[in-house]
Swiss-Prot record:
Name recorded for this polypeptide: Polyphosphate kinase
Biological role: Catalyzes the reversible transfer of the terminal phosphate of ATP to form a long-chain polyphosphate (polyP).
Chain positions recorded as ATP binding sites: N47, Y471, R567, H595
A GO cellular component annotation in the UniProt record: polyphosphate kinase complex
Active site: H437
Entry-linked SUPFAM superfamilies: Phospholipase D/nuclease, PHP14-like, PPK N-terminal domain-like
Statement: the UniProt record of this protein carries the keyword Cytoplasm: no
GO BP annotation list: polyphosphate biosynthetic process
The enzyme's E.C. designation: 2.7.4.1
Binding annotation for Mg(2+): R377, R407
InterPro entries recorded: PP_kinase, PP_kinase_C_1, PP_kinase_middle, PP_kinase_middle_dom_sf, PPK_C_dom2, PPK_N_dom, PPK_N_dom_sf
Amino acid sequence: MSEYTNEHFNNRELSWLDFNERVLEEAMDERNPLMERLKFLAIFSSNLDEFYMVRVGGLKDEVLAGFNRPEDKTGLTPKQQIKSISMRAQELVETQYATYKKITKQLSNQHVRFLRTKHLNKTQQDFVKEYFRTHVFPVLTPIAVDAYRPFPMLLSKSLNIAVEIASNGEGKKRLALVQVPSVLPRYLELPTDDEEHTDLILLEDLIIQFIDSLFKGFVVESTMPFRITRNADMPFHEEGSRDVLKQIEKELKKRRYGVAIRLEVQQRSLRKELLFMLQDVLDLHDRDIFIVDGPIDLTFLFGIYNQIGMEYDDMINETLIPFIPEGLESGKDLFQSIAKQDYLLHHPYHSFDPIVRFIVQAAKDPNVLAIKQTLYRVSGDSPIIKALTDAAESGKQVTVLVELKARFDEEKNIQWAKQLEKAGAHVIYGYKELKTHSKITLVVRILEGGVLQRFIHLGTGNYNDSTAKLYTDIGLLTTNEELAEDATNFFNWLSGYGERPSWHQFETSPDDMKDFFLNKIDDEIKLHEKYGNGRIVAKMNSITDRAIITKLYDASSAGVKIDLIVRGICCLRPGIKGVSENIKVISIIDRYLEHSRIFYFYQNGKEDLYCSSADWMTRNMKKRIEILFPILNASHKTYIKDMMALQLVDNVKARRQRSDGRYVYVKRETNEEEIQSQIIIHQYTGGRWNNIPSVFEREPSNWAEREVLRLRAENEKMTDD
């Protein structure tokens, strides 16, 4: 079928909201511990903030510019998308706050209470009064709003309190604003009579309790907390810039004061006159206003989880200790180990520590001549940055591509770039109009006799030791000569001038990766027509590229069996008769964020397997520098296939997409044991594969079940031996 209609696709933005709904489902899932559910509420809020700042902001820009062309998959115009987004987002936020109320009630039963000032006992009242006097009052600034003092330009995502006041001798009402200080904790832990109990109060409630102290001689008539979200979809103007770093620094200052795109107000404090005034000043449509039944901005729950949650073992997930492969343990010479064999690491089941030590050892090793690395997002106190700094200061040749345009990490990356340059590293920022999203490190080491040996790390995720504990990613440590040659040419291409090199093993975007994928799917179609065994399994964060989607539809129509594991946006619709009936799509949302990108093509038994920094998104194919690399080692292939096999039979955290685009939990059959893939993958990675669910005993009907059945047979054989 060559022509596909709008009904064969999901809209990108609405599909993202479906993903965030799946995040919200984790907060609603009573199988999860209470504090974990709180954390998912915070993740939902954080996700939605960024979505509005970037995606909705971009759509509003298009409307203001008079751009009303339908998008290329579902045919919705920017105006239609904004309307649909608003309706869906309002529904989800309403569900979020209903869930918040339910969870906080359950927490209260477990002696963790969120209190308002009227619920405090005498000791707590005295405590908050003193805290306000010594910690809060000195940093508050009341801002009058009148003809001579116009409504201020409030920072995006800052929490504020609108205050309606009247003088003692007048009936005339006046308006003032008080910003809730972001330099103070959002909540305060209160003294209790029992160490088993935890009582908390929010900073805005505490401020409102004593807000009259800011307006001597006036009576506070009403208060209304509110929060503005501003457009952060501000493209960097690189054309003609002599210094990209300085240009980006300049552009970043504008982001905090972009056009308002969303207003959140608290339902219990709602004052219609104040709301209408804010709506008028900010020039917002009714659909841009979110009236929430609880505290504004639930991202403060991250702090509750990290600080309070850790005190309650029964309210958080049991920690899964990551494994370290033999040969990469602390104290081992990593170069000696990697020279003997390639290592595949699957984070966070495998510790990220060997990757950090790989860079640290390279920085300290006198035989290392050069270190080259791409950095997209790193942690706040990055040991990798420190190691690269030390290496540069010791005289090693250090080349680092720091991506200054990594969304919301720009300021941090500018700081790292300056630090590395000061240390003597050669810092580059990539190509104009492209983001360098590749994850690659090259270490050049001299051996006895002057022979050079190259060590490479390739990955699907960032060099971020913090998120590596939460994101699932694949990493490869190798000395493979062809991969090493490709890595050398890749860095030379980034840092110098010249045409893109010819690769031995790599495929890269924006040049040839998309064509490579289209050709691989075409090959699978041809082989299926000849042998009848076509099979594609792909795992990624999102799929949006129309050309790849339609090529998958062609493959499905030809009879190729396709399984897609897509955590986030999925513009493809599976199960449509005559279009995608041979395609299945699942999404897994669990304790770890599924982040690895893996692509499997059966190829009539050849079984080609690749990992990449790229998703099947148009931006990855056209607007980013990405690397796709093959998995060549047979045991590594087996591990990755086994891992994907387990995910494809997950019946606890997997949701399948229906042909109408909606997601439902994978239904567990009667008497079928629970298969929570992330837990089982952890056991499998550690070699503890002893308890196989009985579901594997039925006749395998697809590639996934055949693979798991094979694993079970191997495990039983090992046990018998």
